[in-house]
Amino acid sequence: MGSRLPPAALTLKQFLVRQQVLGLYRRIVRAVRQIPGAADRQYLQDWARDEFRRNKGASEEIAIRMMISHGQRQLQELERALQLAKS
């Protein structure tokens, strides 16, 4: 009796990390939408997309967690800059 899961199914840990990565990407995209200048907004959208695509093949858990932490810090920096620009 074989497993019903496809051979490429993610483990629970991989699934949770994937959800973290996707959540971070969504938060970055939402933050970038708030940037007033169209050229700056497009530049940062392209940058975020390229960064996530470039690291898509990463498989080491420690490296992925470090990239998530780095992305969260950059997102916080962007959110702070947007708050300062609004005030």
UniProtKB/Swiss-Prot annotation:
CDD domains: Complex1_LYR_LYRM2. One of its GO terms (cellular component) is mitochondrion. GO terms for biological process: mitochondrial respiratory chain complex I assembly. The keyword Transit peptide applies. Keywords: Mitochondrion, Transit peptide. The keyword ATP-binding does not apply. It is found in: Mitochondrion. InterPro entries: Complex1_LYR_dom, Complex1_LYR_LYRM2. Residues 1-19 form a transit peptide. Involved in efficient integration of the N-module into mitochondrial respiratory chain complex I. Belongs to the complex I LYR family. This is LYR motif-containing protein 2. It comes from Xenopus laevis (African clawed frog).
